[in-house]
Amino acid sequence: MLSSLRKSHPVLKIVNGALVDLPVPVNLSVWWNFGSLLGLCLIVQVLSGLFLAMHYTSCVEMAFDSVVHIMRDVNYGWVLRYIHANGASFFFICLYFHVARGIYYGSYVLMETWNIGVVLLFLVMGTAFVGYLLPWGQMSFWGATVITNLVSAIPYVGEMVVYWIWGGFSVDNATLSRFFCFHFLLPFVLMAMVVMHFLFLHQTGSNNPLGINGNLDKIPFHQYYSYKDLLGFFVMLLLLIEFSMLFPNALGDSENFIPANSLVTPLHIKPEWYFLFAYAILRSIPSKLGGVISLVMSICVLFFLPFLHIKGCRGCSYNVFMQLNFWLMIGCFFLLTWIGGCPVEYPYEFIGQVLSVMWFGVFLVRPFLDLLWLYILDY
């Protein structure tokens, strides 16, 4: 009876097609688990954020104190806050693994799914950025001031747009209120985009480690992959809880323990660790407008991967040159993250400039490496 119900009920039929009887390639590896882990991260963030929003006050006089109130007076408020703060870091770790897997195995050939995924990456970054201002600490305040002020680099209308974002002539009460509003709203936009991402993925079918058409050898998602995903859920939740209990402030900034003060500038203004690679590219360009364009293009370059693809080559699994290119990209990412947290002085500034050129270079040379590999195979 249950079997017939899930196949006949209008709502359960959709769920059944998406999660139970979904045909999936037989050879998916553990790297395909990060998609479901991202869904879990989104649920954890929405639920913990919902309870935090019940006790938070989006007013400059009370924002910092309301966070202290959550930590000290609300039952298990400290757990909620640390889970939410470190959950964002785990979200980005899973997100970067998910993108890296897509690049390595050539998932960008599924163009609609890939492009919606890149839009999702921008939305997650935007959500995390507006949330960073909410504790109203020193680094939150100055980070938001510096990053939003970059919009003034837009010719003609830039300064006016900055004032519109701020709601005045500086980051103040209006800015905090609208950032809180956006931080509450954007996760629901994210959910809608995730459904679209899911929809397009099921239209084309999932990629697989071999990069070939897997229609001849598919298995149902449940029970083969559902239990595998559940194991990933338990491992990630265990790591998140353990990290939040033992090292709750390891990924935060000590400046945020000081209430925001517009008269005192921190020694080194920097965003959260998951933005540091893009921030390092921004700082490497002497021109303000050039830096902003480079910042945006450091992620927008992912949109161009389907167009840089050469037919006949898919992913890096069997292409030695593309494997070297991929691991060079990963090395650049980690080094840029390190440079983004260093002061703007020699030799860090010079290293950042070299790494910025390399970051864009590894994407631009991809078609030539594909052609070289095809030439070697034909030879």
From Swiss-Prot:
Cell compartment(s), UniProt: Mitochondrion inner membrane
Sorted UniProt keywords: Electron transport, Heme, Iron, Membrane, Metal-binding, Mitochondrion, Mitochondrion inner membrane, Respiratory chain, Transmembrane, Transmembrane helix, Transport, Ubiquinone
Keyword Membrane: yes
Protein role: Component of the ubiquinol-cytochrome c reductase complex (complex III or cytochrome b-c1 complex) that is part of the mitochondrial respiratory chain. The b-c1 complex mediates electron transfer from ubiquinol to cytochrome c. Contributes to the generation of a proton gradient across the mitochondrial membrane that is then used for ATP synthesis.
PANTHER family listed in its UniProt record: CYTOCHROME B
InterPro entries according to UniProt: Cyt_b/b6_C, Cyt_b/b6_C_sf, Cyt_b/b6_N, Cytb/b6-like_sf, Cytochrome_b, Cytochrome_b_C_euk/bac, Cytochrome_b_N_euk/bac, Di-haem_cyt_TM
Binding site for heme b b562: H84, H183
Miscellaneous: Heme 1 (or BL or b562) is low-potential and absorbs at about 562 nm, and heme 2 (or BH or b566) is high-potential and absorbs at about 566 nm.
Organism classification: Eukaryota, Metazoa, Spiralia, Lophotrochozoa, Mollusca
Gene Ontology CC: mitochondrial inner membrane; respiratory chain complex III
Cross-referenced SUPFAM superfamilies: a domain/subunit of cytochrome bc1 complex (Ubiquinol-cytochrome c reductase) (SSF81648), Transmembrane di-heme cytochromes (SSF81342)
Protein name: Cytochrome b
GO biological process terms on file: mitochondrial electron transport, ubiquinol to cytochrome c
Binding site for a ubiquinone: H202
Cysteine pairs bridged by disulfides in the record: none
Membrane topology per record: Multi-pass membrane protein
Cofactor(s) needed for function: heme b
Organism this protein belongs to: Heterololigo bleekeri
